[in-house]
Structure formats: C-alpha cells, structure tokens
C-alpha cells in the first residue's frame, strides 16, 4: 500500500531506514550506555566513531532522500550510501542480498498462494511475476489486496 501511496523510491527509502533503525536498536546504538553493545566506556567511544554503510544496487540513493522525512523513523547513525549500477555483478554482498531477497519473496508468495482468496493468481507457480496466467487472472478476477495498483497489472 505504501508503494502505491508514496511511490516506489520513497517507499523503498522508508523501508530501508526502518530496517536500519531496527538493526541499530538491536545493537543498542542510540539507546545510551546501558543497552546492547554500548555497555562500557570503550564501546561508547567506539560508537561515537561508528560508521554505517549501505550499498544499493542501482544508480539511485533512495535512502538518503527519505532520511529525516515525516514517514521515516529516527536513525541514530545514518548510513553512508554507495550506489553501484549492476552491483550484483560486481559485489558479492549485493549479489548475496539479491538472492536472499528473491528467495524470501518467492517463499512468501507460496504462502500467500495457499490462501483461498489468492488461488486464482497461481502464485505457487509464478511467484507473482507477470506470467500470462497471472495477467489473465488479474483480468478475470481483478487485482487482489496484495497487488500494487500503481504497477501496470495487465
């Protein structure tokens, strides 16, 4: 819904900032010296010098653009963002993240496919990608609540 409401770039930026804020929270960053890894004066000093990096696969830094916007969470240490066109070809970390994201999404689509309201879309077979059967199901049944309405569905 956020993608349809805000646009893909802004929604991706806010989602990335949510993930970064959650990772920093789990590490105790920004929570004071009593939390997480910030339990000693040495670790507190290290946190003051801590740098967070992010590599985006593509030319657009949607993370920095979303930083400090109304919808973005507070992020104690914003990421230093590097954009790499075709990053999955040149960086093992980006390639690994791309595989993990695709496998995770495909598994999620199979779980959705098991629910009766999504059966017509055959997501167990096409994982939501624009196969002919998937497009025909959208024409026949209309988009589901999970479809991005801003995307060219048919």
Which role fits each region the language model picked out?
Residues 1-154:
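RNase H-like, Mg2+-dependent phosphodiesterase core
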